[in-house]
């Protein structure tokens, strides 16, 4: 028997790429109800019509709640009867957050705190929150807000565990291919328009994972988490230059135009810091970074003289397995978006 049988799952930011993929995964499950919580009524209406057209028998288990994680009351109103939450609501565009950093604070930090407080008060059993590799050694506003979000998660997880209630954990992603606002759809659109691909820096490296892998990571965290745990998938990486060549190999070569890095971009991303590797556990396809459950009484650690040796290096898109162009082609072909684009099927 699955933990999801006859349960109610709420997905914040549920009309986004991740929420749509989770919905497909669970539509035929024995979940009693799936609650889509988001602030965009148009996307909710589009999703509702698509469900009714394609899945008329199971669409009735999906309920829509208009609200904003910034508004605590709207979250509390959607919370009664919820067993589990996947918290995906976020501002995630790096350049936009650079220009409007307080908006990232309001959604990514305060919004997450609102969700977790409401979940704890409502007796939700388990919450899995979604973070990003940009939270590790952050240099931009989005990454800083997500790093603070992670610490909000750990603090709330500690409080909830002390009360013996909600289990709260976190997942950290690399680049989720073909999610909204990501670069592969932009490359495809540029090629179809006959324009050159715009590349920031061909030597940049990024982790690559598809949306199904993103859902699998959340489900693994759901099944294995202790309070405050962080879960990371072992991921392949590619240079932006090779990623562009892979897309051109599939859709045609219209040339490239190197435009330079955008606001707040890194040469490479970090999924797990040296400091986190100290507390990490290799779980096969994933790493678990256990919560740091020390309290503020540091004297006992000094008196006992506990010493931990730091890991040699972080886990980054520069030192993970690097895909060549052919490997990158195979990787991006695992996405439904690219498969549809090759067939001429419009992507929503």
Task: Show the residue positions of the predicted features.
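N-terminal Rossmann NAD(P)H-binding glycine-rich loop of SDR-like oxidoreductase domains
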Residues: 7-29
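Strand-loop microenvironment adjacent to phosphate/nucleotide-handling motifs in alpha/beta enzyme folds
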Residues: 115, 155-348
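Rossmann-fold scaffold of SDR-type NAD(P)-dependent oxidoreductases
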Residues: 12, 79-88, 129
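Conserved residues in the N-terminal Rossmann fold of short-chain dehydrogenase/reductase
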Residues: 38, 65-66, 106, 201, ...
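Conserved Rossmann-fold NAD(P)-dependent oxidoreductase catalytic core, especially the SDR/UDP-sugar
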Residues: 87, 91-147, 155
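Conserved glycine-rich Rossmann-like NAD(P)H-binding loop of the short-chain dehydrogenase/reductase
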Residues: 30-46
